[in-house]
Amino acid sequence: MLCRRGSDYTAEFCHVPVSGELLKRGARDASLVTPARVASAAQTAAVPGCWPLAPLGNAMLWKSVYGGITAALKRAVGSFAFYQPLVLGINTQTGLLVTLRPAASAGEGGGDHVSPRAAIVNVSVEVDLDPAGIEASAASSTGSSLARARLCTLRDGYFLSKRDIALEVEIATKEVSFYRKYDSVQQPANKRRGDMADLFVVHERTLLLGGCKRMGVKVLLPRTFDCLVASSQSVSGLAAMALYKQWHATLFSVELPDTVVQIFAYLGPELNPCGEEVDYCCFVGFPGLPTLKASSSTTEAVRDAMAAYRLSDGLWPALGMSAFHFLAPWDPEDRWPGESEAKRVEGAVHRLQLGTEDDWGAGRVSCILESDAVMQGPWFAKFDFSAFFPTLYLLLFPANERLAEVVRLRARGQHPTLKLALVSFFGGLQHINPVAYRSIIALSNGISKRLEHEVNQRGFAICTYVKDGFWGAAGNLPSDSVSYADALVYAEELRSAAQKAALGHVSEMGFSLPEGVHLNLRLEGLFTDAISWSTHCYWLYNRFTKMEDFVGFPAKSGAGRAAKASLSALLPLVAAVCDSSDMSTLHQSVRGACEQLVAGAFAERNNPQFWSTRTGIESSTLLPPAVYRNGSLLDRDCGQREIVLTRKHDCESPSPVPWTLFPPPLVLGRIDCMVYLTSIFKTYLSMLNRAISASCDADESMNVDFPISDYAFLFT
């Protein structure tokens, strides 16, 4: 454990028993995680200067080990949180840490959590691997992450030539600037600045295990920082591996009797054949301090990355949906954290009447509007619960203080990067604890019914309800005679009453929330106009404030976003149509808007960024052969791909090209703009005409037509 004492750092060591039951707790396939397999994997990862690729093809086991050790440590020495002032109990005879407790008084250094101290690292690497090997590795897995294929090729030793690995690294703190550039990592640096001794010292100690076995340990101790932060945009997992591999080889270059080699294993999205939604860099064991991935190099992004690390004790995002389960508290008889609470929930499910809410097995999704509708007259309002499902989880598991802390912060709008952590937590609950998942769904459905009854009593009709939010109409509140200010007063009273109804429902069930956690219903907006196409597709608009909420138009590309903005600008005209003159004006406006879209598309016809869409790796496996030759650019291919469709000849089918995986200057075939425009205009005109028909009870002759095929010549 890396510990900060004043302005200095030290290392403490603890001997922690980890049960096979706990190791299996974090695994989808528990049969693959056994103590014997874990011991074998650890031995493979403890070779001086090895590539940290033992988890490649075995990431589930290593994630179980990482989470299990973190949880077991807290059982062994006492519950604690990262960056929390602590009092350490050390056995002076063995040299081992045996107890931890919060530093309660100022004299012991107590108080609020302290902040991480970051060193900014930027590292790039060139590893010349065989393109044929990369292609073969990509083809052999269910998914074709090219970053993973590169790691497989590296592990198997398929180098294109004997040219060595080139490495460039810069590490900056407030006190130190360190730089090295190696044309070959086997040779001294040809450019250098600063000294490694300014960053780290080597700490060695002898420990006594089991009362008699002596074991030597050797670790790197940072001098002025406790985490390394890298930008996802510039530092790949392979680059970090190459850097730390050199450090690992140097630290353990001399074999000493009874001194153990530190485990060196990498966890990251590159290990998944289909990539992962969040980029992260997690090393189990060496170098002994975290490497955090920030979304960019801005100060705010760095702070968000450090906050996510601190609030999850380093388990998010590496452990995904399991992270906050490993942070649950231990009861004395538990085999895994939170086991006793889980049993109590199983004993209380009769209160929730599971099985009676089968209409909404994944949470309420309903819409009373059976067809397209254009609505005006009353005020409309939209409401949404904050961190709804994790909050309901805390009704069942109120002792999970680490999850409660994140829910409280998100309720205050802090740390937006943790929103995905909460979404992942509940999304995976049905796999980790199906009874708890079904219980929470039953609770949420019961809340929706109680809430709906309450707002109906106050003259508000819910039009659409989706899981944790809803919108509807205040039938006794006409927007042409009730001011916006008065409508806000009504909406706030309605919000408060609905929230009280929700709290009343859970209280009657016998549940209560942890201190500081609330079931918060938020007013998302007040609107004068509403158009509904379906449960998940609607447009809400306020004529007075110009505020809008447009949900459901496909806007994954720049072209799609431009079309959505164009349609959004037309919908107020649709809502205002009263006679044939208005309809004529609308038709002219639509044609002008469509022509502007075409003109904008023409201006961007050669810009892949405007047309490309983010596509799952598993959905874009047909790749151009040239992509496998693009070296370190492929190390970025561990999440969704930016795909653009190109066509060389009119007679052939469009080809998907992952254009961000090619170096500049890009030499693409002709972007198949018409494929995109045809789909976009089909949706655009369909939604527009359905809204017109709903607004005017018009026949098809009133529909707007714009033959996009007439403009195909512009894009050939």
Swiss-Prot record:
GO terms for cellular component: host cell nucleus. It is found in: Host nucleus. HAMAP family: HSV_HEPA. This is DNA helicase/primase complex-associated protein. One of its GO terms (biological process) is DNA replication. It comes from Equine herpesvirus 1 (strain V592). The keyword Transcription does not apply. Keywords: DNA replication, Host nucleus, Transferase. Belongs to the herpesviridae HEPA family. Its main location: host cell. Component of the helicase/primase complex. Unwinds the DNA at the replication forks and generates single-stranded DNA for both leading and lagging strand synthesis. The primase synthesizes short RNA primers on the lagging strand that the polymerase presumably elongates using dNTPs. The primase-associated factor has no known catalytic activity in the complex and may serve to facilitate the formation of the replisome by directly interacting with the origin-binding protein and the polymerase. The keyword Transferase applies. One of its GO terms (molecular function) is transferase activity. Associates with the primase and the helicase to form the helicase-primase complex. Interacts with the origin-binding protein. Interacts with the polymerase catalytic subunit. It comes from the Viruses. InterPro entries: HSV_HEPA.
